[in-house]
Amino acid sequence: MDKGKSVKSTEKSVGMPPKTPKTDNNAHVDNEFLILQVNDAVFPIGSYTHSFGLETYIQQKKVTNKESALEYLKANLSSQFLYTEMLSLKLTYESALQQDLKKILGVEEVIMLSTSPMELRLANQKLGNRFIKTLQAMNELDMGEFFNAYAQKTKDPTHATSYGVFAASLGIELKKALRHYLYAQTSNMVINCVKSVPLSQNDGQKILLSLQSPFNQLIEKTLELDESHLCTASVQNDIKAMQHESLYSRLYMS
């Protein structure tokens, strides 16, 4: 038997993933530091201006202390955040590995059509566009041909979908990309709670510490989900996001 054919046959039978479309022009870039940088609160995409409905919960006295803030976070993370943010990140990451631009754009279209609150649709689009433009402004970073093609074609990017394409394009492992994104976005939610409820800084840190086990469960759950679960969202959170549009006073854009 031809050894070359045997090796190729074995690769197909075990379902080996295709090579990550990583560019060789980034030999000077340390992905460990880069993933910290793009998930940092100072990465200029404007995340701090959005609460994604949380401000309504606070003004309606649904979130008033550490306990209710933790309850809100667990509910939000295990519903809307899991089935929209985390799952879309995974789907676009996997599609980027296959260089399937059509599927990525399809995922983004589903999210746009499934997001009822106007403020959330606008927030998703603004954060996604800002994430892409900020990466492109980093001239030392070569994102590769596929990411550049995606950046030109996408009409409704979100932070999660563009981040998924980014991570795949630079060869960042999926589980690591999910872990950093999940922690960073949850940390933003906790900061909003600390500022707006308000909570003490110590309470904020206690909340983050208590979420470590749920974090691991959410990541494992994300890896099990497929496209049929995309945007299985929380109706309650959509309602609060819509109510946010007519709040008398507000600190956040959503």
UniProtKB/Swiss-Prot annotation:
Residues 1-11 have a biased composition (Basic and acidic residues). Residues 1-26 are annotated as: Disordered. It is found in: Cytoplasm. It holds the Pfam family UreF. One of its GO terms (biological process) is metabolic process. One of its GO terms (cellular component) is cytoplasm. Keywords: Chaperone, Cytoplasm, Nickel insertion, Virulence. Disruption phenotype: Cells do not express urease. UreH, UreF and UreG form a complex that acts as a GTP-hydrolysis-dependent molecular chaperone, activating the urease apoprotein by helping to assemble the nickel containing metallocenter of UreC. The UreE protein probably delivers the nickel. Belongs to the UreF family. This is Urease accessory protein UreF. The gene is ureF.
